[in-house]
Amino acid sequence: MAYRKLGRTSSQRKAMLRDLTTDLLINESIVTTEARAKEIRKTVEKMITLGKRGDLHARRQAAAFVRNEIASENYDEATEKYTTTTALQKLFSEIAPRYAERNGGYTRILKTEPRRGDAAPMAIIELV
């Protein structure tokens, strides 16, 4: 199995990939190092494919990986209540239908200038 170690233990690496994947699903674009961007591309593609499948098993598999974070919060003036959407709900209701006709290639990596301080190669990863 080929993967990048990213200078971390396996548990730290898995936690970081879960965090970055969740952040990308919520914000649809993040700035990170090039190596991290190439690694999270794999997990994001898998999550969107699970979202496209849409059955209960796919939803549970995605819920086991994606963090339970609030993606958006809206105030409904009629009922005077806040409605929140989690990252998992956004994946299945907004992101997956957008890519219904697309077979893979849901992300784009754009290289940017090196990071100031350590000159690490940086990249923007975004949903197409």
Swiss-Prot record:
Protein keywords: Ribonucleoprotein, Ribosomal protein
Statement: the UniProt record of this protein carries the keyword Transferase: no
Q: Which GO terms describe its cellular component?
A: cytosolic large ribosomal subunit
Tell me the GO BP annotations in alphabetical order: translation
GO MF terms, alphabetically ordered = structural constituent of ribosome
InterPro entries according to UniProt? Ribosomal_bL17 (IPR000456), Ribosomal_bL17_CS (IPR047859), Ribosomal_bL17_sf (IPR036373)
User: Highest taxon of the source?
Assistant: Bacteria
Q: How does it assemble?
A: Part of the 50S ribosomal subunit. Contacts protein L32.
Q: What protein family is recorded?
A: Belongs to the bacterial ribosomal protein bL17 family.
Task: State the name under which the record lists this protein.
Answer: Large ribosomal subunit protein bL17
